Amino acid sequence: MSKGSGGITARIIDFTLGLRLADLPPAVLNEARHGLVDTLGVALAGVAEEPASLLRDVQLQAGAAGPCTVLGDARTAAPMTAAQLNAYAAHVLDFDDTQLSTTPDRIFGLLTHPTVPPLAAALAVGERQKATGAQVLEAFLVGFEVECKISEAIHSHHYKKGFHSSGTVGTFGAMAATARLLGLDATQIGHALAIAASMASGIRVNFGTMTKPLHVGRAAQNGVTAAELAARGFTGGGDALDGPWGFFQVFSFADGFDPDRIVGVLGNPHTIVSPGVSIKPYPCGVLGHPSMDAMRTLVLTHDVKPEQIKAIRLRAGSNILNPLRYKVAKSELEAKFSPPFMLSAVAIRRKAGIHEFTDEFVLSEPVQAMMAKVTTVLDPEIEARGFEKIRSTVEVDLLDGRTLVQPADERYRDRKSTRLN
């Protein structure tokens, strides 16, 4: 529980106004450029997905025209609509980066998908404003840092009890990026924060459905809308983040926040550099990635063929097994949160990319048969070690009587230490 905020809302406002690209170290700019390229690539792949097409059809109906590019479509849109559609496309594959936490009390040691909301907002608004590339990059970095530090500060119950922080906190990242490009003053940013706080949304029951990426799309859209409204004189309450009825108190179920994760650390260091982000080798829930790596190691090291496998066991803690909740995946979207599918895909094809995460492959007879061989086990020893890392062990029983065992690597993928191959 926070005992005092020290004017957190005001500090966010000051940071949003004060960051200058010329003052940033080269490492921050380098990581930002990598993030932009990675996320745009993921978004371009995502536009071909059916849910992204459905959303475009609804949002680009007559009367929704505007000057901003919509990826994968010849039509253009207003900034808030373009931001939503492009952010949805960037998250629909579940292939975008993930924020690493600085402290061990955060479940998984992970927080938001930080790049998509501020980037989608900055690109759409920047296009309408005819901003320079440097101005768009500056706005993106403002939004990225605001989003990440708010995510660090709010009590972990925000996520544990059901909110999807990429949707809720991502709204503030998109708002801050937009506010910077619109040139809002301190009073207007305060109103925009309050508007954004009332628009923040996203609940985890929708993981494994078309609605999960809508959380991120709406974060981008709502952030743009909040700043656009404030620019036109629309008002909101004061102390929107740290007031007694503010975002931190309400969205943490009254458990508050840690002001020390914002006070004095906004841009010091920049989260994009330290602790950085985890990049994904597979287009699915990051909680399953270490187990998939372990399965791939077993299959390749021992040259295991699918027909040799009698049974597969995944031993893990509840921080993996509860969120990855689909025991038998019946669609591509469910497969993204299904350990039996994740391990089955690797067992059958020795990889798991966008060509494996399709309804056709998920529903194929070999995959459904392999999933039936997979069981998940809540391991008390792993559970006792805590939740700050994604820990698991994969065991494969072969028909010849051997059992192969591979503990998963606890380290997260990043751009510096792990090649994606």
Give, region by region, the residue ranges found by the protein language model.
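Hydrophobic alpha-helical hairpins/lids featuring a short glycine-rich hinge
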Residues: 91-152
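Short connector loops/turns at beta-strand edges and beta->alpha or beta->beta junctions
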Residues: 117-119, 146, 198-202, 265-269, ...
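Well-ordered alpha-helical scaffold segments within catalytic/enzyme domains
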Residues: 46, 122-129, 175-182, 227-229, ...
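Short amphipathic alpha-helical face segments that pack within enzyme cores
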Residues: 116-124, 145, 169, 173-177, ...
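Terminal-appendage/accessory-domain detector
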Residues: 1-111, 208-221, 225-419
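Glycine-rich, mobile lid/loop segments that gate access to catalytic sites or pores
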Residues: 126-225, 237-244
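Residue-level detector of well-ordered alpha-helical segments, enriched
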Residues: 28, 32-35, 117, 135, ...
